[in-house]
Amino acid sequence: MTRVKRGYVARKRHNRILKLTAGSKRAHSRLVRPAQQQAMKTLAYSHRDRNRRKRDFRHLWIARINATVRQYDVSYSQAISLIQKSKMLLNRKMLAQIAVLDNSSFNSILTAAIYST
């Protein structure tokens, strides 16, 4: 049986792994075995943090809405309940943007929600 040389295939695989970990420090960007471990960990972190980002932004939107709503002596839960009962199709992201960028519009939305119920 003839000998199969895999130098080209192995080098190609190694270069692909090293390219993934190009920004890492020390051996994680130079040696294949630590680089492979680092690449696996990096991909796991990025997968986890894609879902975490959604959660974090929702927390941020809620905090912004809560801070703005408290100025009008209404709690966050009361404000969300009033907005939903008044059949306004505004989600938390929209409300947070309005609260940050245009406070008077947010005030009119809140008063409309209060008086419509």
Curated annotation (Swiss-Prot):
Keywords: Chloroplast, Plastid, Ribonucleoprotein, Ribosomal protein, RNA-binding, rRNA-binding. GO terms for cellular component: chloroplast; ribonucleoprotein complex; ribosome. The keyword Chloroplast applies. The keyword Cell cycle does not apply. It comes from the Eukaryota. InterPro entries: Ribosomal_bL20, RIBOSOMAL_L20_CS, Ribosomal_protein_bL20_C. It is found in: Plastid, Chloroplast. Belongs to the bacterial ribosomal protein bL20 family. Binds directly to 23S ribosomal RNA and is necessary for the in vitro assembly process of the 50S ribosomal subunit. It is not involved in the protein synthesizing functions of that subunit. This is Large ribosomal subunit protein bL20c. The gene is rpl20.
